[in-house]
Amino acid sequence: MVVVGVLALQGDWIEHIELLREIEGVEAVPVKTEKQLESIDALIIPGGESTTIGRLIERRGLLEPLRDRIRAGLPVLGTCAGSILLAKKVRDRVVGPVEQPLLAVMDIAVLRNAFGRQMNSFEAEVHIEGVGTVHAAFIRAPIIEETWGEARPIAKLNHPLLGEVTVAARQKAIIATVFHPEITGDSKLHKLLVAAAKGRAF
């Protein structure tokens, strides 16, 4: 049995739990404490409000424990706000540079709210390297502006206003997506995370 934790401080963590429970051989658990973090084989950082999630991570004393486990090789999937929290550099489309707590474990720069407001949300088919085509929901989504070091793009999207943009990246056992696969019920990335937790090629 593979234990996959979902950071459950704010955001749409319940949708991830429900999707994980449909995968055979997986126990899906909410993670709110350092003790719960210690017992998992993989982690999902869900969408939500990245500044709020970051502050709650700090308040609960989870910032360093999360960084330590991820740097030690814990497989991680960060979706939407999760990709922002994983990034080493973050700015906002409207206000520019922002000050917010970050895990800062991934060599990516993220632009918050890149597609505009909630009314500009949309769904699209996205081809992800090594995964296949995922039906993705973009809700006040960021984009990955830059990758360097050990991170590399694994999915791009042609947008009518922004042109070609990076919407997913990978660094070792970490995957960041700017979209929500859980909202559309697409479990391909979740199954990839489970495979990584089992020690299969990632």
Swiss-Prot record:
This is Pyridoxal 5'-phosphate synthase subunit PdxT. Belongs to the glutaminase PdxT/SNO family. Its EC number is 4.3.3.6, 3.5.1.2. CDD domains: GATase1_PB (cd01749). Catalyzes the hydrolysis of glutamine to glutamate and ammonia as part of the biosynthesis of pyridoxal 5'-phosphate. The resulting ammonia molecule is channeled to the active site of PdxS. GO terms for molecular function: glutaminase activity; pyridoxal 5'-phosphate synthase (glutamine hydrolysing) activity. Pathway: Cofactor biosynthesis; pyridoxal 5'-phosphate biosynthesis. Keywords: Glutamine amidotransferase, Hydrolase, Lyase, Pyridoxal phosphate. HAMAP family: PdxT. In the presence of PdxS, forms a dodecamer of heterodimers. Only shows activity in the heterodimer. L-glutamine binds at residues 48-50, 112, 139-140. It comes from Hyperthermus butylicus (strain DSM 5456 / JCM 9403 / PLM1-5). It catalyses: aldehydo-D-ribose 5-phosphate + D-glyceraldehyde 3-phosphate + L-glutamine = pyridoxal 5'-phosphate + L-glutamate + phosphate + 3 H2O + H(+); L-glutamine + H2O = L-glutamate + NH4(+). GO terms for biological process: glutamine catabolic process; pyridoxal phosphate biosynthetic process; pyridoxine metabolic process. One of its GO terms (cellular component) is glutaminase complex. The active site is at residues 80, 180, 182. Signal peptide: none annotated. Disulfide bonds: none annotated.
